[in-house]
């Protein structure tokens, strides 16, 4: 069942002025009850966003579209005669910003596109850190607490997944991206404002995340659920395919460093803490093989090294 209900939209400009308390309360409610919210007036230049969108769509047409069509042929997906549950209808590539950029290692990107994505990535990195401090304020944690936890000894990891979801002749047969929660910290999504597709699971119903011009969609990953001892939630979400239009998605993931030690914040923990303590890289190794499964068994498995192997026998695999 799909519903259209009021999705939380936060105007960050209202953090300055008499509406600050109300705005902070809206952010807190979204983190507790949605795991998602959308921000406007976030400080990112609109011309930079427009340019990134334009060049991403051009890059897909020039460098990615044929690869996507070849993938469909190789997997026998041109006709979609049956429901497909183990493949996503998406074209993607990844940019790594931190701890070391791979921006100049990606083939077929124009210099102009590289420059735009470098600028875009840096601004999103700064925005992510500002948002983490807002979460700290709402949680009663000292300013910088989440950034410090994410830092570990090597600094945070930060990367961007650039995706296109082409038109699909039979949307009922395949998802653009199967349902999952995100493993990491805080995710900042710049999505197409004309072609819909992103949905989140709330109270048993799939809810559309509305595409708003020049907005950024924020969602929380599993690590923030652990650190907040379940006060904030990572939520299942998916991308549904559409018969018309190519949906663009630029999702940037601000995650803990590989050796960051993750555990519930002491001020948020209680005697009956349900969430485990672990090293982020160990969680990612587990997540690699069970991404599209519920998060709760992952949390439980992290309490027991043997359970990790049982849940995902290939847990030694590295992932983005």
From Swiss-Prot:
Keywords: Ethylene biosynthesis, Fruit ripening, Iron, Metal-binding, Oxidoreductase, Vitamin C. Residues 156-256 form the Fe2OG dioxygenase domain. The keyword Iron applies. GO terms for molecular function: 1-aminocyclopropane-1-carboxylate oxidase activity; L-ascorbic acid binding; metal ion binding. This is 1-aminocyclopropane-1-carboxylate oxidase. It comes from the Eukaryota. It catalyses: 1-aminocyclopropane-1-carboxylate + L-ascorbate + O2 = ethene + L-dehydroascorbate + hydrogen cyanide + CO2 + 2 H2O. One of its GO terms (biological process) is ethylene biosynthetic process.
């Amino acid at each position: 069942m799909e519903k259209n209900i009021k999705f939380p939209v936060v105007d960050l400009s209202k953090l300055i002025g008499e509406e600050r308390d109300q705005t902070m309360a809206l952010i807190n409610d979204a983190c507790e009850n949605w795991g998602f919210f959308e921000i406007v007036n976030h400080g990112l230049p609109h011309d930079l966003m427009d340019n990134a969108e334009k060049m991403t769509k051009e890059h897909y047409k020039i460098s990615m579209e044929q690869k996507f069509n070849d993938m469909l042929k190789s997997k026998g997906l041109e006709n979609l005669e049956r429901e497909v549950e183990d493949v996503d209808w998406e074209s993607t590539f990844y940019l790594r910003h931190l701890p070391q950029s791979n921006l100049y290692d990606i083939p077929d990107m124009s210099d102009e596109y590289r420059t735009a994505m470098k600028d875009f990535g840096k601004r999103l990195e700064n925005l992510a850190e500002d948002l983490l401090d807002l979460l700290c304020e709402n949680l009663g944690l000292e300013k910088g607490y989440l950034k410090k936890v994410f830092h570990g000894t090597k600094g945070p990891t930060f990367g961007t997944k650039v995706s296109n979801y082409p038109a699909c002749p039979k949307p009922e047969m395949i998802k653009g991206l199967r349902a999952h929660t995100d493993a990491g910290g805080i995710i900042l999504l710049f999505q197409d404002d004309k072609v819909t597709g992103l949905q989140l699971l709330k109270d048993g119903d799939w809810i559309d995340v509305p595409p708003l011009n020049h907005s950024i969609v924020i969602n929380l990953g599993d690590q923030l659920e652990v650190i907040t001892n379940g006060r904030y939630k990572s939520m299942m979400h998916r991308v549904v395919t559409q018969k018309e239009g190519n949906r663009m998605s630029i999702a940037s993931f601000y995650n803990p460093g590989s050796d960051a030690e993750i555990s519930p914040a002491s001020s948020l923990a209680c005697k009956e803490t349900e969430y485990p303590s672990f090293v982020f890289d160990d969680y990612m190794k587990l997540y690699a093989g069970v991404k599209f499964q519920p998060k709760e068994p992952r949390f439980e498995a992290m309490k027991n090294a043997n359970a990790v192997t049982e849940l995902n026998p290939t847990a030694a695999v590295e992932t983005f």
